Amino acid sequence: MAATSDRTVYRATTTAPVNIAVIKYWGKRDASLNLPTNSSLSVTLSQRSLRTLTTASCSAIYPAADELILNGKPQDIQTSKRTLACLSNLRSLRQALENADPSLPKLSTLPLRIVSENNFPTAAGLASSAAGFAALVRAVADLYQLPQSPLELSRIARQGSGSACRSLMGGYVAWRAGEREDGSDSLAEEVAPASHWPEMRAIILVVSAEKKDVPSTEGMQTTVATSSLFATRAASVVPERMAAIETAIQNKDFATFAEITMRDSNSFHATCLDSWPPIFYMNDVSRAAVRLVHDINRAVGRTVCAYTFDAGPNAVIYYLEKDSEVVAGTIKAILGPNTEGFDGPFYDILKNVTASVVPLEKVDSRAVEILKNGISRVILTGVGEGPISVEDHLVSATGDILAS
């Protein structure tokens, strides 16, 4: 870290990943603390495909108020209770260090300038808030040189965006709902590192990059208040599935992992449909993707792929690397090789696939047509690591905002 002077700009930069839940988080028992009604579990996706890059900086030369710039646009921090809560908690931890060691520079007293960029559309059902808040918390924690572990920091990230706590770790991550009123036991925990089951792959079918009709927070509140299915899901369905899918991950049992993933996605969207008024996140293209996955599994004679949908129409389809040609190759044959996204670090295995491995007559022809016309791009990815500290700063040594 730079030497202390009146004009010193302190900086730390990190990347953070997107995570896609296989056991869904939906509904809060305490909205102010972002405490969930049920536990959840996700796969952290590779940052070679999707990531948020965030630089946290502080300096006496900055204006008095903290600043946050997201994808080039200034954000109003003062109206975001979630962001304020994260920054307040991180400042308190830094202040404790400074109180214990008076020789440390008083970074907790300096205004922050935080600059963040996603390499994917924000608020389009790609879990941008999870990566965003995880990157913010990790970058500020690094700036402040905090000793807290990712598990401890996950309590803070949770207050920004519930699912952000899971993006502070790589691999397969559980968010334990906890029981305490203060939320101290509601935190993320690594179930298995990416290295335990590195063969996990995913293809994201991007249906629309438009902003969703019903924001997640609003949708959750409606479901909790009006869905009779919801209480049963939270109380009995999810706890059983959490235990079963954690065992499946430890055993690298894809068939069980896949069935639980698909059933839980269906269960989550059933509670949305059971809300009053009903909430529709999936559309005709989403349902065509569901039919395609079941048709591929049926044609192959075993479970080789699994769909899951968050609060949006995009399909995330999990499969193992050894089945890339069967799953992603069939999708490539349906959509055409010129569809945006059939490139990059996870594409090598598909380069020579020119025809569908699964005979297309075994796939619902209506689903094929809907997918052809309804998918704007794909994202090829796989299980990956947690946040990574980098030197690609978005703020210069003199405090100026840079482009990545």
From Swiss-Prot:
Enzyme's top EC category: lyase
Biological role stated in the UniProt entry: Diphosphomevalonate decarboxylase; part of the second module of ergosterol biosynthesis pathway that includes the middle steps of the pathway. Mvd1 converts diphosphomevalonate into isopentenyl diphosphate. The second module is carried out in the vacuole and involves the formation of farnesyl diphosphate, which is also an important intermediate in the biosynthesis of ubiquinone, dolichol, heme and prenylated proteins. Activity by the mevalonate kinase erg12 (AFUA_4G07780) first converts mevalonate into 5-phosphomevalonate.
EC number: 4.1.1.33
Gene3D superfamilies per the UniProt record, alphabetical: 3.30.230.10, GHMP kinase, C-terminal domain (3.30.70.890)
Transmembrane segments: none
Entry binding sites for (R)-5-diphosphomevalonate: 25-28, 82, 161-166, 217
SUPFAM superfamilies per record: GHMP Kinase, C-terminal domain, Ribosomal protein S5 domain 2-like
Gene symbol of the encoding locus: mvd1
GO molecular function: ATP binding; diphosphomevalonate decarboxylase activity
Protein name: Diphosphomevalonate decarboxylase mvd1
